[in-house]
Amino acid sequence: DTFDIIKRITQDTINQVYPHYYPAGVVVFFQEHHNDSNILTDIAQGKVFVVQDKDEYIGTVTIDGNEINRLFVLPQFHKNGYGSKVMDFAEKEIFSKYSKIQLHASLPGKKFYIERGYSAVEYRTKKVCCDDWICIDIMEKRAPDVEKEK
């Protein structure tokens, strides 16, 4: 079902990619942040979208107002344009209602977001498990026609 697909994509991506960028405590933080309850709540509220290519589920994104959350593409599908297609979809959805998009950029995705025109507007740190620290950039992108602030 949808929950199992999203959980698998999210946790597999965190488990395979994030240890190359973060200490163990931060990886645990991401695993726990994207827990069953949060995923189920977002699904129930109609905020979650799944990317499918033929019969394979390869990615997911959550859209919450003007925020892009939980954007993951399975590692074996990286560098094939799927992330860009997911972002194209999410940006189109959000820009139809809002003049700017906001997201929290993890290290693995930061370069991707910069290349898509996002700029860091805030930097946050938080102490997590095992005396490790998570560092996150809050990034924004403005719509080409910045007239409609909804």
Language-model features: locations:
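A short, internal acetyl-CoA/4′-phosphopantetheine-binding micro-motif in the GNAT/acyltransferase core
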Residues: 68-79
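Conserved acetyl-CoA pyrophosphate-binding loop and the N-cap/start of the following alpha-helix
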Residues: 77, 81-89
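C-terminal "cap" of GNAT-fold acetyltransferases
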Residues: 99, 104-110, 116, 122-150
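A short beta-loop-alpha structural element at the N-terminal edge
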Residues: 1-8
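Conserved GNAT-fold acetyl-CoA-binding loop/helix
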Residues: 11-37
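Conserved beta-hairpin
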Residues: 45-59
